Amino acid sequence: MGTRPDEPGDRMSAPPTDRLAHTSSRGVFVTMGGFGGKTLIQLASTVVLARLLSPADFGLVAMVTAIVGVADLVRDFGLTGAIIQARKLSERMWMSVMWLSVALGIGLMLLIAASAPLIAWLYDEQRLIPLTLAIAPILLVNGLTMPMQARVQRDLRFGTLANIDVVSMLVGVGLGIATAALGWGVWSLVVMSGAGQVYRLVALWVASRPRFGRPHISREVLPLVTTGGSLFGVQLLNYATKNLDNVVIGQQLGPAALGQYSRAYALYLLPMQQLNGTLGRVALPVLSKLQDDPERFRRYTRGALMIIGYLTIPVYAVAAAVSSPLVAILLGPGWEEAATLFSILALAGIAQAIGSVLGWLYLTLGRAHKQLLFFVITRPILIAGYFVGIWWAGVEGLALVFGVLSLLLLIPELVYATSGTFMRVRDILAPIARPLVLAPLCFGAAFAVERATDGMPAILQLVLGVAAGVVPLLASLAIPAYRRDLAQIVGFVKQVRKPARTAPASDAAASGSAEPDEPTGESSAAARSDVDEVILDDAELARERKAEP
């Protein structure tokens, strides 16, 4: 079956290496732009909806989504990650994946709808029955969406995904705010989620133009299901860890307390979604294509970790220090508990920002089964911590135990995730060591100023606190090692601005069948390697060290 000209199809399973650097680095920034747009829209929705709705409204929806999310994981069954990691996929396999995903979506939609009374009984909240029935169809929408999104992502069409992400969120948030202003209450949150997902389905359908064929699930899809099964186990345990806290709080303390926690948790996720989500969407397909090239794989991973280290760890440190004025500005009065919870959750944010990169290693190196084994052992510890924490000190105790355990469990996982691979523990620790040193300094400076300005307008407290938190970052540039780190990040940015290199004319002529937009010179005439262009190579670093005074 032929491939349409505008769809890379299977040729993207092994793209020419001399375009991979440009594609991946530009993909990071295109995707970051998309996530940046989503972050601004999400912040705007948080600011507006927190003033139109009550904490209990957010808590009711969080109760339902904590359960529906489990069904959505079953619906995906790890197939998204398996598709991205696979070296090659035939058109027949694509059709089978699409029909399998649709079947799972329909089945789980009906199961959740039938379980609505049980969910209401669990929380002792009858208002959850109609909410559950209204949210359940999202499972079918996601079942249709998943294979199309995986295909677009596998084909490295990051600009398309970024545009769809932003517009779908804009559609959902716009309708959610409009209905909240009209007095729809909790139902405006249902509208916001559903409208965005429906638009996403339509946009991805247009972008990928799927061919479903006749209803049939081929046996060729079994390897994907096998790989996906391990990923599903990991995702299920991870989801349980990240959502059973909602169930525990909602069941023990009610929707109002859960509403405070859910808004704090949403703010805590923003830095991680913006940066780790951006890099992860690009890194997974790129690293999967570099799994047979250890040196380039290590360089790309170290570079991504360095960016995460400098742009995530200090952000959490400063945001935790100024959480009171930050939450007062974003959410308004009545959300003071959310500010305290956000500060505590920042501990988990730092641990999970680093831990997400370990997830890349498991997936792209085909070791999902090892991650599943680690999660089977460690995730029950985190879940038990929820019960200990809420018994000890309520919702704040739960958040603190979660943060501390997340940091402690990261240490053995560093060793476990790299054992038996060409990756070394040093490859993970070296890029984040210097940002970790800066984190307490940034927190201390920001917190001191925030306390000293207590009583001033919240916006002034926030600006002065953030400015103080940035001072240690700027002062660190007096140290050569930090300047070298900055040079590597700048080198990444420069790569984005360079046009993608094409093959010499002689090579193109010799090939005879090259398409105009495809590089053809993959011989020894190719200059620097692909990922070496994304992260400055050792020779360039050596020259920079010599040039420093």
Regions found by a protein language model. Give the residues of each.
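Alpha-helical transmembrane segments of multi-pass membrane transport and lipid-handling proteins
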Residues: 2-9, 13, 99-124, 130, ...
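Membrane-interface junctions at transmembrane-helix termini in multi-pass inner-membrane proteins
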Residues: 24-25, 82-90, 141-165, 182, ...
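Specific pore-lining/lateral-gate transmembrane helices of multi-pass inner-membrane transport
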Residues: 85-101, 260-376, 492-494, 498
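Interhelical loop/hinge segments that connect adjacent transmembrane helices in multipass membrane
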Residues: 3, 9-20, 24, 159, ...
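Hydrophobic alpha-helical transmembrane segments
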Residues: 129-136, 164-210, 223-229, 234, ...
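Signature of the first transmembrane helix
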Residues: 2-10, 20-77, 104-116, 133, ...
